[in-house]
Amino acid sequence: MSGLCACTLVGAAQVQQLEAALFAAGMPVEALMEKAGLRLAAAIAADYPAGGYPRVGVLVGPGHNGGDALVVARELWLVGRSVQVFCPRPPIKPLARAHLDYFQSLGGRVHTGAVPEEPGVDLWVDGLFGFGLERPVAEPYAGLMAQVNASGVPVAAVDLPSGLSSETGEALGGLAVRAARTYCLGLWKRGLWQDAALDWLGVPVRLEIGFSEAQVRSVLGEDHRSARLLLPDAARAGLPLARPATAHKYSVGTLLAVAGSRQYGGAATLVALGARSGGPGMLYLALPESLADRVAARLPEAIVHPCPQAENGALADLPGVDLEKFDAVVCGPGLGKAEQALVLRLAREAAGALVLDADGLNLIAGQLEVLAQRAAPTVLTPHPGEFKRLFPDIALADRQGAARTAALRSHAWIVLKGARTVVASPSGQVWVNPGGSPALARGGSGDVLAGLLGALLAQCENPEPAVLGAVWWHAAAGEWLAARHTVLGVDAETLALGLLPFLAADGP
């Protein structure tokens, strides 16, 4: 299996370019459809064995997606399944029509027009529409899709569920087939890894159909680096961070966290716990003076700077803090209504990497141009609401594209949090983390991530492995902990304290 093909995310136009290159090189269209259909049939037969799913209904649309599904229908029929084909309208593509005729010649049943209220199937195969759909599905297909969704019968979708945008993952017009499994052919379609697709996708499975790594590089050029999955093997390759035998506390990262307020006192503790798990040699905390004793008692190894606080309990200033001596600075968790000048000072004076999270993002909004003047890396970690405050003109329907645009504009790394967190580099590379758990939908989870990011950045000259490693580690630990404590049992403190046990359990 090609590593590049396993992680590259493509849109409809890129798929068309790849297929055109295959056909120009001599691959017959018929051979590609046959190969795709055979791979689909084998996967579906394995995942849905005949003992539990003897009766299969195959939904056939007007194009080549329907042709792939008809190959599946033929193969399942030939091994003894009861197969019915539902074809509201005859296929437009001649090749798909030929497969339909052949299926009928074998004695297969084909239904045109309306589907019976009780079709008598144990499994649907959705081959109505594939990639490139740009508008809501019309009748008679829309009614059929609604009927399938209401049937309660599992659906195996070909390439992507019918009705989904292959770019944004949204259900066009609000209607798509709700799949139990989606068998993506060749390269991953971008839309399958957008948050909007999660309600429709089921379990995503990728099937190889013949794209080689050389062909992908030849056709897409540098575009093959524009969007990819953050695969676990690559993300955790450098974790835990290696240390030479001669390491000392000042050589393995000095980190400053600027966090907390009277209203959000726990945030300072959580960012510090997340940072501690990342293993910086020295951890400094700049906190409102009212929080200093409490946090120092919880993290005795941290060096705490009690700082003046305003009447509202927010951090007022950083007296005596030399921002040039830190390898990384984290700012924002729980800051509350601090002054914008505080964050602007950090952006201008911090010599090391800078992570802005939570209130740090809100305070830098409208002043992002200051980030372009920084020599060291900057990482912005917004959730969708914070993203809209930072970049009000960038639509979030395409989260991958939005993160990329924001990164290019701000000259910063963007960690766009969500069910599938998107990471974009200042050069425009995009990664989507396929892992994670709704267990992380808890206040304070982001504070832990901010601290972990800062800790790894403080120890890495190259920000890429630090950012990608932290995003993967945080999400994967959440999954691991949810499996042990249930989805309701992963509060932010449990997450922070579980980071290192997870990494030890997941290690070689």
Curated annotation (Swiss-Prot):
Q: Which residues bind K(+)?
A: N65, D126, S162
- Catalyses which reaction(s): (6S)-NADHX + ADP = AMP + phosphate + NADH + H(+); (6S)-NADPHX + ADP = AMP + phosphate + NADPH + H(+); (6R)-NADHX = (6S)-NADHX; (6R)-NADPHX = (6S)-NADPHX
**Spans annotated as ADP-dependent (S)-NAD(P)H-hydrate dehydratase:** 232-508
Q: What does this protein do?
A: Bifunctional enzyme that catalyzes the epimerization of the S- and R-forms of NAD(P)HX and the dehydration of the S-form of NAD(P)HX at the expense of ADP, which is converted to AMP. This allows the repair of both epimers of NAD(P)HX, a damaged form of NAD(P)H that is a result of enzymatic or heat-dependent hydration.
Question: Which parts of the sequence are annotated with region: NAD(P)H-hydrate epimerase?
Answer: 1-224
Q: Where is this region: NADPHX 1?
A: 64-68, 130-136
YjeF N-terminal domain segment(s): 15-217
Q: Tell me what this protein is called.
A: Bifunctional NAD(P)H-hydrate repair enzyme Nnr
The gene behind this protein is nnr
Q: Which family does it belong to?
A: In the N-terminal section; belongs to the NnrE/AIBP family.
Q: What is the lineage of its organism?
A: Bacteria, Bacillati, Cyanobacteriota, Cyanophyceae, Gloeobacterales
Q: Where is this region: NADPHX 2?
A: 383-389
Please list the GO terms describing molecular function: ADP-dependent NAD(P)H-hydrate dehydratase activity; ATP binding; metal ion binding; NAD(P)HX epimerase activity
Which amino acid positions bind (6S)-NADPHX 1, per UniProt?
A: Y141, D159
What positions does the entry give for (6S)-NADPHX 2 binding?
Answer: G334, D447
Q: Which biological process terms from the Gene Ontology are attached to this UniProt entry?
A: metabolite repair; nicotinamide nucleotide metabolic process
Q: Which Enzyme Commission numbers does its entry carry?
A: 4.2.1.136, 5.1.99.6
* Domain (YjeF C-terminal): residue spans on this chain: 232-506
- The UniProt record gives the binding positions of ADP as 417-421, 437-446
SUPFAM superfamilies, alphabetically? Ribokinase-like (SSF53613), YjeF N-terminal domain-like (SSF64153)
> Which cofactors does the annotated protein need, by name?
K(+)
* Keywords noted in UniProt: ATP-binding, Isomerase, Lyase, Metal-binding, Multifunctional enzyme, NAD, NADP, Nucleotide-binding, Potassium
By its UniProt entry, which HAMAP family does this protein fall under?
NADHX_dehydratase, NADHX_epimerase
